[in-house]
Protein backbone atom coordinates (compact mmCIF):
# COMPACT_ATOMS: atom_id res chain seq x y z
CA UNK A 1 0.00 0.00 0.00
CA UNK A 2 2.76 2.46 0.95
CA UNK A 3 4.68 1.97 -2.30
CA UNK A 4 1.46 2.84 -4.15
CA UNK A 5 0.95 5.95 -1.98
CA UNK A 6 4.54 7.12 -2.56
CA UNK A 7 4.02 6.63 -6.31
CA UNK A 8 0.85 8.78 -6.16
CA UNK A 9 2.73 11.45 -4.22
CA UNK A 10 5.41 11.58 -6.94
CA UNK A 11 2.67 11.90 -9.56
CA UNK A 12 1.09 14.72 -7.55
CA UNK A 13 4.42 16.59 -7.29
CA UNK A 14 5.00 16.15 -11.02
CA UNK A 15 1.54 17.61 -11.74
CA UNK A 16 2.29 20.59 -9.49
CA UNK A 17 5.46 21.27 -11.47
CA UNK A 18 3.64 21.03 -14.79
CA UNK A 19 0.86 23.35 -13.60
CA UNK A 20 3.38 26.03 -12.67
CA UNK A 21 4.73 26.06 -16.24
CA UNK A 22 3.64 29.08 -18.38
CA UNK A 23 3.59 26.74 -21.38
CA UNK A 24 0.80 24.64 -19.80
CA UNK A 25 -1.10 27.71 -18.66
CA UNK A 26 -1.34 28.82 -22.29
CA UNK A 27 -2.97 25.54 -23.36
CA UNK A 28 -6.42 25.62 -21.72
CA UNK A 29 -7.39 22.04 -22.60
CA UNK A 30 -4.16 20.59 -21.20
CA UNK A 31 -4.38 22.89 -18.16
CA UNK A 32 -7.95 21.68 -17.46
CA UNK A 33 -6.92 18.00 -17.65
CA UNK A 34 -3.89 18.53 -15.38
CA UNK A 35 -5.97 20.53 -12.87
CA UNK A 36 -8.52 17.70 -12.73
CA UNK A 37 -5.79 15.08 -12.22
CA UNK A 38 -4.19 17.27 -9.51
CA UNK A 39 -7.55 17.71 -7.77
CA UNK A 40 -8.23 13.95 -7.86
CA UNK A 41 -4.93 13.20 -6.07
CA UNK A 42 -4.94 16.11 -3.61
CA UNK A 43 -6.95 14.51 -0.78
CA UNK A 44 -5.15 11.16 -0.73
CA UNK A 45 -1.70 12.79 -0.88
CA UNK A 46 -2.56 15.21 1.94
CA UNK A 47 -3.85 12.37 4.16
CA UNK A 48 -0.76 10.27 3.35
CA UNK A 49 1.56 13.13 4.30
CA UNK A 50 -0.18 13.56 7.67
CA UNK A 51 -0.03 9.78 8.20
CA UNK A 52 3.71 9.70 7.44
CA UNK A 53 4.33 12.72 9.71
CA UNK A 54 2.50 10.94 12.56
CA UNK A 55 4.68 7.84 12.09
CA UNK A 56 7.78 10.03 12.31
CA UNK A 57 6.44 11.67 15.48
CA UNK A 58 5.70 8.21 16.93
CA UNK A 59 9.29 7.10 16.33
CA UNK A 60 10.58 10.33 17.92
CA UNK A 61 8.41 9.89 21.01
CA UNK A 62 9.54 6.27 21.42
CA UNK A 63 13.12 7.58 21.47
CA UNK A 64 12.12 10.03 24.23
CA UNK A 65 11.03 7.11 26.43
CA UNK A 66 14.75 6.40 26.91
CA UNK A 67 15.21 9.81 28.53
CA UNK A 68 16.06 9.72 32.23
CA UNK A 69 13.62 12.56 33.04
CA UNK A 70 10.27 11.04 34.22
CA UNK A 71 8.34 14.12 33.04
CA UNK A 72 9.66 13.76 29.49
CA UNK A 73 8.83 10.03 29.59
CA UNK A 74 5.26 10.79 30.74
CA UNK A 75 4.80 13.37 27.95
CA UNK A 76 6.15 10.90 25.39
CA UNK A 77 3.75 8.16 26.57
CA UNK A 78 0.82 10.57 26.28
CA UNK A 79 1.83 11.48 22.72
CA UNK A 80 2.35 7.81 21.80
CA UNK A 81 -1.14 6.88 23.07
CA UNK A 82 -2.75 9.71 21.06
CA UNK A 83 -0.84 8.84 17.86
CA UNK A 84 -1.46 5.08 18.15
CA UNK A 85 -5.17 5.78 18.49
CA UNK A 86 -5.18 7.97 15.37
CA UNK A 87 -3.01 5.86 13.05
CA UNK A 88 -5.47 2.95 12.43
CA UNK A 89 -8.22 5.47 11.59
CA UNK A 90 -5.95 7.17 9.05
CA UNK A 91 -4.86 3.82 7.62
CA UNK A 92 -8.52 2.90 7.08
CA UNK A 93 -9.12 6.29 5.42
CA UNK A 94 -6.16 5.72 3.08
CA UNK A 95 -7.51 2.27 2.12
CA UNK A 96 -10.85 3.85 1.24
CA UNK A 97 -9.16 6.59 -0.79
CA UNK A 98 -7.18 3.93 -2.68
CA UNK A 99 -10.34 2.08 -3.76
CA UNK A 100 -10.91 2.36 -7.53
CA UNK A 101 -13.14 5.32 -8.28
CA UNK A 102 -16.43 4.72 -10.06
CA UNK A 103 -15.91 6.61 -13.36
CA UNK A 104 -19.60 7.57 -13.32
CA UNK A 105 -19.52 9.21 -9.86
CA UNK A 106 -18.92 12.69 -11.29
CA UNK A 107 -21.98 12.54 -13.53
CA UNK A 108 -25.38 14.18 -13.33
CA UNK A 109 -28.31 11.78 -13.06
CA UNK A 110 -31.57 11.05 -14.80
CA UNK A 111 -34.05 10.14 -12.06
CA UNK A 112 -37.11 8.05 -13.01
CA UNK A 113 -39.91 7.42 -10.51
CA UNK A 114 -42.86 5.20 -11.43
CA UNK A 115 -45.98 4.36 -9.43
CA UNK A 116 -46.11 0.63 -8.73
CA UNK A 117 -48.76 -1.45 -6.99
CA UNK A 118 -51.36 0.53 -5.06
CA UNK A 119 -53.23 2.59 -7.65
CA UNK A 120 -53.77 6.27 -6.84
CA UNK A 121 -51.98 5.95 -3.48
CA UNK A 122 -48.87 4.66 -5.31
CA UNK A 123 -49.03 7.65 -7.69
CA UNK A 124 -49.22 10.05 -4.71
CA UNK A 125 -46.25 8.28 -3.12
CA UNK A 126 -44.29 8.64 -6.39
CA UNK A 127 -44.98 12.40 -6.18
CA UNK A 128 -43.85 12.44 -2.52
CA UNK A 129 -40.59 10.70 -3.46
CA UNK A 130 -39.90 13.17 -6.27
CA UNK A 131 -40.52 16.06 -3.87
CA UNK A 132 -38.17 14.43 -1.32
CA UNK A 133 -35.36 14.19 -3.87
CA UNK A 134 -36.09 17.74 -5.07
CA UNK A 135 -35.68 19.08 -1.50
CA UNK A 136 -32.44 17.12 -1.06
CA UNK A 137 -31.11 18.42 -4.39
CA UNK A 138 -31.92 22.01 -3.33
CA UNK A 139 -30.02 21.49 -0.04
CA UNK A 140 -27.03 20.16 -2.02
CA UNK A 141 -27.10 23.13 -4.40
CA UNK A 142 -28.03 20.92 -7.37
CA UNK A 143 -30.41 21.87 -10.21
CA UNK A 144 -33.49 19.82 -11.09
CA UNK A 145 -35.26 19.87 -14.46
CA UNK A 146 -38.40 17.81 -15.16
CA UNK A 147 -37.87 15.98 -18.46
CA UNK A 148 -41.16 14.11 -18.62
CA UNK A 149 -44.18 13.50 -16.39
CA UNK A 150 -47.52 11.74 -16.44
CA UNK A 151 -49.79 13.26 -13.78
CA UNK A 152 -52.93 11.70 -12.28
CA UNK A 153 -56.19 13.50 -11.44
CA UNK A 154 -55.32 13.67 -7.73
CA UNK A 155 -51.89 15.27 -8.27
CA UNK A 156 -49.83 12.09 -8.15
CA UNK A 157 -47.55 10.77 -10.90
CA UNK A 158 -47.82 7.56 -12.88
CA UNK A 159 -44.28 8.44 -13.93
CA UNK A 160 -41.96 11.41 -13.55
CA UNK A 161 -38.47 11.77 -15.00
CA UNK A 162 -36.06 14.53 -13.98
CA UNK A 163 -32.47 15.56 -14.66
CA UNK A 164 -30.44 16.41 -11.53
CA UNK A 165 -27.28 18.41 -12.29
CA UNK A 166 -24.48 19.36 -9.93
CA UNK A 167 -21.32 18.20 -8.20
CA UNK A 168 -20.93 14.38 -8.02
CA UNK A 169 -24.70 13.76 -8.09
CA UNK A 170 -24.41 10.10 -9.18
CA UNK A 171 -21.98 9.29 -6.34
CA UNK A 172 -24.64 10.33 -3.79
CA UNK A 173 -27.78 9.12 -5.56
CA UNK A 174 -26.79 5.81 -7.18
CA UNK A 175 -28.00 3.61 -4.31
CA UNK A 176 -31.58 4.93 -4.52
CA UNK A 177 -32.51 2.62 -7.41
CA UNK A 178 -35.05 -0.03 -6.43
CA UNK A 179 -38.56 -0.53 -5.11
CA UNK A 180 -39.64 1.86 -2.35
CA UNK A 181 -42.60 0.60 -0.30
CA UNK A 182 -44.95 2.83 1.72
CA UNK A 183 -47.30 1.86 4.54
CA UNK A 184 -49.81 4.56 5.50
CA UNK A 185 -53.50 5.46 5.80
CA UNK A 186 -54.58 7.10 2.52
CA UNK A 187 -56.47 10.42 2.70
CA UNK A 188 -59.47 8.70 1.07
CA UNK A 189 -59.55 5.86 3.64
CA UNK A 190 -62.54 6.30 6.00
CA UNK A 191 -61.91 3.20 8.16
CA UNK A 192 -58.36 4.24 9.11
CA UNK A 193 -56.85 1.13 7.54
CA UNK A 194 -53.17 1.09 6.62
CA UNK A 195 -52.54 0.48 2.91
CA UNK A 196 -49.30 -0.76 1.37
CA UNK A 197 -48.23 0.57 -2.00
CA UNK A 198 -44.97 1.00 -3.88
CA UNK A 199 -43.03 3.08 -6.37
CA UNK A 200 -39.90 2.18 -8.30
CA UNK A 201 -36.94 4.53 -8.54
CA UNK A 202 -34.24 4.33 -11.21
CA UNK A 203 -31.13 6.51 -10.92
CA UNK A 204 -29.12 6.58 -14.14
CA UNK A 205 -25.95 8.50 -15.00
CA UNK A 206 -26.61 11.24 -17.55
CA UNK A 207 -25.19 10.29 -20.93
CA UNK A 208 -25.12 11.73 -24.41
CA UNK A 209 -25.20 10.36 -27.92
CA UNK A 210 -21.45 10.95 -28.40
CA UNK A 211 -20.56 8.90 -25.32
CA UNK A 212 -22.67 5.98 -26.50
CA UNK A 213 -22.15 6.41 -30.23
CA UNK A 214 -25.89 6.19 -30.93
CA UNK A 215 -26.24 5.69 -34.68
CA UNK A 216 -29.12 7.49 -36.46
CA UNK A 217 -30.11 4.24 -38.20
CA UNK A 218 -30.61 2.61 -34.77
CA UNK A 219 -33.26 5.17 -33.79
CA UNK A 220 -36.93 5.33 -34.73
CA UNK A 221 -39.03 8.44 -34.02
CA UNK A 222 -42.84 8.38 -33.82
CA UNK A 223 -44.91 11.52 -33.29
CA UNK A 224 -48.40 11.75 -31.79
CA UNK A 225 -50.66 14.18 -29.92
CA UNK A 226 -50.03 14.91 -26.24
CA UNK A 227 -52.60 13.83 -23.67
CA UNK A 228 -53.20 15.11 -20.14
CA UNK A 229 -54.61 13.51 -16.96
CA UNK A 230 -57.55 11.24 -17.75
CA UNK A 231 -56.43 10.91 -21.37
CA UNK A 232 -57.89 14.17 -22.73
CA UNK A 233 -55.96 15.74 -25.60
CA UNK A 234 -54.05 18.86 -24.59
CA UNK A 235 -52.53 19.66 -27.94
CA UNK A 236 -53.87 20.04 -31.45
CA UNK A 237 -50.51 19.31 -33.08
CA UNK A 238 -48.40 16.15 -33.15
CA UNK A 239 -45.77 17.44 -30.70
CA UNK A 240 -45.30 14.34 -28.52
CA UNK A 241 -42.37 12.14 -29.52
CA UNK A 242 -41.62 8.46 -28.94
CA UNK A 243 -37.99 7.41 -29.47
CA UNK A 244 -37.11 3.72 -29.90
CA UNK A 245 -33.58 2.31 -29.82
CA UNK A 246 -34.05 -0.53 -32.31
CA UNK A 247 -31.15 -2.85 -31.22
CA UNK A 248 -32.29 -2.97 -27.57
CA UNK A 249 -36.00 -2.18 -27.92
CA UNK A 250 -35.73 0.55 -25.26
CA UNK A 251 -38.47 3.15 -25.79
CA UNK A 252 -38.87 6.67 -24.38
CA UNK A 253 -41.91 8.94 -24.81
CA UNK A 254 -41.86 12.71 -24.16
CA UNK A 255 -44.83 15.06 -24.37
CA UNK A 256 -44.22 17.79 -21.76
CA UNK A 257 -43.07 20.45 -24.21
CA UNK A 258 -45.24 22.10 -26.88
CA UNK A 259 -42.36 21.82 -29.31
CA UNK A 260 -41.72 18.51 -31.08
CA UNK A 261 -38.02 19.45 -31.33
CA UNK A 262 -37.73 19.94 -27.54
CA UNK A 263 -39.56 16.69 -26.80
CA UNK A 264 -37.21 14.88 -29.19
CA UNK A 265 -34.13 16.36 -27.45
CA UNK A 266 -35.44 15.37 -24.01
CA UNK A 267 -36.33 11.89 -25.26
CA UNK A 268 -32.80 11.36 -26.59
CA UNK A 269 -31.32 12.50 -23.26
CA UNK A 270 -33.42 9.97 -21.31
CA UNK A 271 -32.71 7.22 -23.86
CA UNK A 272 -28.95 7.80 -23.71
CA UNK A 273 -29.01 7.54 -19.91
CA UNK A 274 -31.05 4.32 -20.01
CA UNK A 275 -28.57 2.79 -22.46
CA UNK A 276 -25.60 3.85 -20.32
CA UNK A 277 -27.32 2.38 -17.24
CA UNK A 278 -27.92 -0.89 -19.12
CA UNK A 279 -24.18 -1.03 -19.90
CA UNK A 280 -23.38 -0.29 -16.25
CA UNK A 281 -25.79 -2.99 -14.99
CA UNK A 282 -24.13 -5.52 -17.31
CA UNK A 283 -20.67 -4.50 -16.06
CA UNK A 284 -21.81 -4.89 -12.44
CA UNK A 285 -23.27 -8.33 -13.16
CA UNK A 286 -19.94 -9.47 -14.60
CA UNK A 287 -18.07 -8.07 -11.59
CA UNK A 288 -20.50 -9.77 -9.21
CA UNK A 289 -19.87 -13.14 -10.83
CA UNK A 290 -16.11 -12.65 -10.58
CA UNK A 291 -16.17 -11.62 -6.91
CA UNK A 292 -19.31 -13.51 -5.82
CA UNK A 293 -20.47 -10.32 -4.13
CA UNK A 294 -22.71 -7.57 -5.41
CA UNK A 295 -21.43 -4.11 -4.57
CA UNK A 296 -23.78 -1.18 -5.11
CA UNK A 297 -25.50 -2.26 -8.30
CA UNK A 298 -28.63 -0.25 -7.68
CA UNK A 299 -30.65 -3.35 -8.61
CA UNK A 300 -34.09 -2.08 -9.56
CA UNK A 301 -35.95 -5.33 -9.02
CA UNK A 302 -35.67 -5.68 -5.24
CA UNK A 303 -37.53 -3.89 -2.45
CA UNK A 304 -34.88 -1.67 -0.92
CA UNK A 305 -36.72 0.54 1.57
CA UNK A 306 -39.96 0.76 3.56
CA UNK A 307 -41.55 4.04 4.67
CA UNK A 308 -43.88 3.28 7.61
CA UNK A 309 -45.93 6.41 8.37
CA UNK A 310 -47.86 5.15 11.46
CA UNK A 311 -44.55 4.32 13.17
CA UNK A 312 -42.65 7.29 11.72
CA UNK A 313 -39.81 5.09 10.52
CA UNK A 314 -37.78 4.37 7.40
CA UNK A 315 -36.03 1.01 7.07
CA UNK A 316 -33.42 0.28 4.41
CA UNK A 317 -33.47 -3.49 3.95
CA UNK A 318 -30.06 -3.72 2.25
CA UNK A 319 -28.14 -2.51 5.30
CA UNK A 320 -30.78 -3.17 8.00
CA UNK A 321 -30.81 0.48 9.03
CA UNK A 322 -33.94 2.01 10.59
CA UNK A 323 -34.31 5.75 11.19
CA UNK A 324 -37.16 7.26 13.20
CA UNK A 325 -37.42 10.63 11.46
CA UNK A 326 -39.85 10.04 8.64
CA UNK A 327 -41.24 13.61 8.46
CA UNK A 328 -37.77 15.14 8.11
CA UNK A 329 -36.75 12.37 5.68
CA UNK A 330 -39.69 13.14 3.38
CA UNK A 331 -38.62 16.81 3.48
CA UNK A 332 -35.31 15.83 1.89
CA UNK A 333 -33.15 15.12 4.96
CA UNK A 334 -31.87 11.86 3.51
CA UNK A 335 -28.12 12.51 3.87
CA UNK A 336 -27.64 10.15 6.87
CA UNK A 337 -29.16 7.26 4.93
CA UNK A 338 -27.06 7.98 1.83
CA UNK A 339 -23.88 8.22 3.95
CA UNK A 340 -24.65 4.82 5.53
CA UNK A 341 -25.21 3.25 2.10
CA UNK A 342 -21.96 4.69 0.74
CA UNK A 343 -20.02 3.46 3.82
CA UNK A 344 -21.55 -0.01 3.39
CA UNK A 345 -20.57 -0.12 -0.29
CA UNK A 346 -17.00 0.95 0.58
CA UNK A 347 -16.76 -1.73 3.28
CA UNK A 348 -17.97 -4.38 0.83
CA UNK A 349 -15.45 -3.16 -1.76
CA UNK A 350 -12.62 -3.40 0.80
CA UNK A 351 -13.68 -6.96 1.66
CA UNK A 352 -13.82 -7.89 -2.03
CA UNK A 353 -10.37 -6.38 -2.57
CA UNK A 354 -8.96 -8.31 0.41
CA UNK A 355 -10.37 -11.55 -1.04
CA UNK A 356 -8.74 -10.85 -4.41
CA UNK A 357 -5.27 -10.21 -2.95
Curated annotation (Swiss-Prot):
The modification N5-methylglutamine is found at residue 232. It comes from the Bacteria. It comes from Oleidesulfovibrio alaskensis (strain ATCC BAA-1058 / DSM 17464 / G20). One of its GO terms (molecular function) is translation release factor activity, codon specific. Its main location: cytoplasm. Keywords: Cytoplasm, Methylation, Protein biosynthesis. It is found in: Cytoplasm. HAMAP family: Rel_fac_1 (MF_00093). SMART domains: PCRF (SM00937). GO terms for cellular component: cytoplasm. SUPFAM superfamilies: Release factor (SSF75620). Gene3D superfamilies: 3.30.160.20, 3.30.70.1660, 6.10.140.1950. Peptide chain release factor 1 directs the termination of translation in response to the peptide chain termination codons UAG and UAA. Belongs to the prokaryotic/mitochondrial release factor family. This is Peptide chain release factor 1. Methylated by PrmC. Methylation increases the termination efficiency of RF1. InterPro entries: PCRF (IPR005139), Pep_chain_release_fac_I (IPR000352), Pep_chain_release_fac_I_sf (IPR045853), Prokaryotic/Mito_RF (IPR050057), RF-1 (IPR004373). The gene is prfA. PANTHER family: LD18447P.
Amino acid sequence: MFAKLEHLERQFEDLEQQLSSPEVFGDQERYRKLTKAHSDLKEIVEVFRVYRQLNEELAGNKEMLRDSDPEIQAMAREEIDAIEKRLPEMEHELKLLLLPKDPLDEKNVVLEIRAGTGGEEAALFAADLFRMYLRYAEDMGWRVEVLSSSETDSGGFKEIIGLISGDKVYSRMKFESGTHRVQRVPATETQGRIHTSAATVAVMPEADEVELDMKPEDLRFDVYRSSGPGGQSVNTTDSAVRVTHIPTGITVACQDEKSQHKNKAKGLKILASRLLQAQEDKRHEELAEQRRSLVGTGDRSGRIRTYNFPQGRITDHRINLTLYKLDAFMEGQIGDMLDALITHAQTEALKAQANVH
